[in-house]
Structure formats: structure tokens, C-alpha cells
């Protein structure tokens, strides 16, 4: 099938210009600048006049809960939410049941995704104290990288032996994506909070327990290991101004920001409670503003969601009882477009952070850019198209979002994955299936 996307402003590789994109089957075959509609025989013509066209979002950080935790979410429901949000590729984390820490578990997950996932997929292999030989010998074409928990979080995959950490950083040929929080500091803070506030301290104390110090000390340790060994380190979900001081000097040591930490502050616990409880914790307005500034100065290189659905019953309680994590994949792009409107970053920088840089960092094969010969993963977004998040519009299986009630001015109008329009104006092709992403080819 031959498709023409015309009339829109193409945002790609640092420039915005009116251009048409020609797609044949699953591949971009031509990019034609100018306002004139190209002539030709097309099976499908998409009018993007008044809209912006950009490469589909690559979300490097999701927890789709499949396998083993599918009462909360699964690949089918969450990849549908991704498509509604303009996300055409996701990389899923390994803290599932079973954990993705063996080749057998990775193969099973890949096989499951073939029949379930509506958009393209990749899966991190997880490091443990006992599987370093496995993760350092894995086929580099199969996975984006190695996920390392240097702080204890959902799934109990903490790697806390210093000899194992050093060996991993020395041997790893793939990027290491690290969750950095110091568990000893967190445990001390929790003990102190429980002495003061009871067994289950209110969620407003979450950033005191999973504190700036806990994040900084662990991140500093990871950066030092990467500097010593030459490992390619990408630190997940920055939350503090202090941590950001460790970045910006080495192209092999980079950092991610996620949507929750760019939008919310600790003041929002009063309004949203445990719905915004996540690890690492949302911190101060000063920290949030520092993260926003780092989007444009090079210290933050990718935007993810850390999409981590839970049932609302699992979010009951406080710091000790309530589960950490929130669904966000459906709203990442429109939220970042709001930051564009607010002058935080340019549209071109948004595309770098959400498509180009993830593709470059993890060496994604033929995705992440609008280029001839690349896979036709595109998203069309429309400005000045207000809509409000309601229970009915939320696609995640858990059925809630901290963004519920929020009115966006931007709307994802169309999502194209591998040349096929899977989402258009609230209509979704449930028969669509994505592809396994290949790396380093």
C-alpha cells in the first residue's frame, strides 16, 4: 500500500518545514518539501494541514506488567494506550514475573509480544547478583541494553554486591540503564519516619524517605563506575538538581527524565496523594525546574514515562503500603507539547529527546527519524484542539491516570506504525501488531 501524508509541518532532525512524506508498505520512500501536493497514485492520502508531523515516540522506559502482573496491565492494553499517545516503540523493563533475567524469559516475552503488542517493542535484560555472564554475553541485536537496579524498587531486583557491579560495568558492551537510589539511606529514612509518624507514614513524606541524598549518592557511585570502566551508562529518571551536576561532561554518561518529575512537585501530594507516588520520589519545585532547564542544555538526553500501572486498591495507604508507579504512556507527548507551549523547550528539541536520541543511544535500526529507507513510524499532532482526560478516554487497563480531569490543548490525531495507520481521531485498529525492534544493525 502506498500512502501520502501531505500538508503538515514536518519536525525532524532539528528543523520544521512544510513537507510531504511518501510511504510504500512499511517504509518511507520520499520526503518532498513544499506546500504543493505531490502527484502520483496513492492508495491512501492523509491530509495533515494545520498539524505537525514527527517521528513516532520511542519510550525507553515502561513497565507493561506482562507477564505475571496482568491484573494491572498487559502488552495489549498498554500498547493500545501507547498508540493513542503517539508512541510507536517502547522498551519494557525486566521486573515482571518471572523477571526478564534469562534468555528463556526474554524469548518468552518476545513471543508473547508478537501476538499482543499493537506497536513496536524491545525488552531490557535485567542484571542480578547472579547473572552477569548471561547479560554481558547476550546478542546485542536483540535488546536495547541492560537494566540495573542500584536501588531497591518494585520487583526486588537490587544488585548490591560491589564486586558484581564492578564486573558488570567492566564487561558490559551494551548500555546500562540504571535505577539509582541508595537502599541503606532509604531504609534509615524509613525507620526514622516510622518512629515519627507511625508504621505507614503519609505520602507527603515519600520525598524525605527516598531523598535527594539517596538519589545523589547512588548516582554518583554509578557515574564513578562508568568513568573508571568506560561503560555506557544511562541513568534513569533524574529527580534532583544535585544529581544533574554529575552530567554533561561525557557523551558516554547520560541521563533520562520522566514525565512525572517534569510536571509534578511535592506540593501535588496534597491534591493527588498516592496516585503520584513513584520511585524515585517526586521532589521540590526547584528540582523540577532544574530538570526542565536540563532538557535544553544537554544534561538530559531522553524523555521516558516510567509507565507503571497499578490498580487503585494497590495505591491505598501511605509510604509503606501504597504501590509506587503510575500510568503515563498515553499522555507523554501531549504533556511535553504543553511544555513547548510554555517555552520550556522547542518542538525540535522535543523530537530529539523523544525520538532521535533514544534511537541513537540504543542504536535502534531504522527508526526514530523521518528518513528515506526508514520504517514509517509517524505521529501527527494537532494544536488548538482541546480535550479533557476522562475515565472514558484512558486506555490503560488500570482505568485511572493522575492526568484525569486535565484539559490538553494538543491532540494526537494520527499514529502510523510500520506504514499502517493504527490510530486516527479516536478510532483504533485493534488488529494491528507491531514488530520486534532490532538494534546495532
Feature locations, PLM:
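Histidine-centered catalytic micro-motifs
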Residues: 56-67, 177-181, 238, 305
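Histidine-rich, glycine-flanked metal-binding segment
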Residues: 1-4, 9-55
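A glycine-rich helix N-cap at a beta->alpha junction
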Residues: 111-127
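His/Asp/Glu-enriched, well-ordered alpha-helical/loop segment
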Residues: 200-221, 225-230, 296-303, 308-383
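Divalent metal-coordination and catalytic microenvironments
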Residues: 8, 21, 26, 50, ...
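Histidine/acidic residue-rich metal-binding segments in metalloenzymes
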Residues: 133-303
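Metal-associated gating/positioning segment near the N- to mid-region
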Residues: 49-116
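C-terminal cap of metal-dependent C-N hydrolases
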Residues: 372-438
Amino acid at each position: 500500500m502506498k500512502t501520502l501524508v501531505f500538508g503538515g509541518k514536518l519536525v525532524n532532525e532539528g528543523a520544521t518545514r512544510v513537507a510531504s512524506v511518501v510511504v510504500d508498505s512499511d517504509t518511507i520512500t520520499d520526503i518532498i518539501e513544499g506546500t504543493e501536493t505531490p502527484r502520483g497514485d496513492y492508495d491512501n492520502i492523509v491530509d495533515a494541514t494545520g498539524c505537525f508531523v514527527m517521528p513516532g515516540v520511542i519510550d525507553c522506559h515502561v513497565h507493561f506488567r506482562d507477564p505475571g502482573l496482568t491484573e494491572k496491565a498487559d502488552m495489549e492494553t498498554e500498547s493500545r494506550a501507547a498508540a493513542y499517545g503517539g508512541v510507536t516503540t517502547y522498551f519494557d523493563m525486566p521486573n515482571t514475573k518471572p523477571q526478564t533475567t534469562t534468555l528463556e524469559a526474554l524469548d518468552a516475552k518476545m513471543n508473547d509480544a508478537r501476538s499482543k503488542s499493537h506497536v513496536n517493542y524491545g525488552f531490557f535484560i535485567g542484571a542480578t547478583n547472579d547473572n552477569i555472564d548471561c547479560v554481558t554475553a547476550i546478542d546485542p541485536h536483540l535488546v536495547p541494553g541492560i537494566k540495573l537496579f542500584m536501588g531497591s524498587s518494585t520487583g526486588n531486583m537490587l544488585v548490591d554486591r560491589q564486586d558484581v557491579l564492578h564486573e558488570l560495568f567492566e564487561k558490559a558492551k551494551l548500555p546500562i540503564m540504571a535505577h539509582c537510589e541508595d537502599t541503606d539511606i532509604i531504609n534509615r529514612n524509613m525507620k526514622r519516619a516510622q518512629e515519627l509518624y507511625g508504621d505507614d507514614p503519609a505520602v507527603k513524606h515519600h520525598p524525605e524517605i527516598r531523598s535527594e541524598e539517596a538519589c545523589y549518592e547512588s548516582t554518583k557511585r554509578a557515574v564513578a563506575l562508568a568513568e573508571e570502566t568506560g561503560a555506557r551508562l544511562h541513568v534513569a529518571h533524574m529527580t534532583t538538581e544535585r544529581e544533574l551536576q554529575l552530567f554533561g561532561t561525557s557523551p558516554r554518561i547520560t541521563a533520562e527524565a520522566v514525565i512525572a518529575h517534569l510536571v509534578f512537585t511535592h506540593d501535588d501530594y496534597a491534591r493527588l496523594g498516592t496516585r503520584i507516588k513513584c520511585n524515585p520520589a517526586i521532589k521540590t519545585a526547584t528540582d523540577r525546574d532544574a530538570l526542565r532547564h536540563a532538557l535544553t542544555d544537554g544534561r538530559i538526553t531522553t524523555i521516558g514515562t516510567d509507565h507503571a500501572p497499578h490498580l487503585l486498591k494497590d495505591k491505598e495507604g501511605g509510604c509503606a503500603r501504597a504501590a509506587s508507579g503510575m500510568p503515563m504512556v498515553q499522555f507523554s507527548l501531549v504533556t511535553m507539547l504543553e511544555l513547548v507551549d510554555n517555552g520550556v523547550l522547542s518542538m525540535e528539541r522535543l523530537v530529539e529527546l523523544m525520538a532521535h536520541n533514544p534511537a541513537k543511544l540504543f542504536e535502534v535500526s531504522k527508526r526514530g527519524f523521518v528518513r528515506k529507507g526508514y520504517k514509517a513510524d509517524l505521529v501527527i499532532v494537532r494544536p488548538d484542539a482541546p480535550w479533557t482526560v476522562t475515565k472514558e478516554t484512558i486506555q490503560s487497563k488500570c482505568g485511572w491516570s493522575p492526568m484525569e480531569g486535565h484539559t490538553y490543548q494538543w491532540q494526537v490525531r494520527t499514529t502510523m506504525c510500520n506504514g499502517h495507520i493504527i490510530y486516527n481521531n479516536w478510532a483504533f485498529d485493534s488488529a494491528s501488531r507491531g514488530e520486534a525492534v532490532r538494534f546495532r544493525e
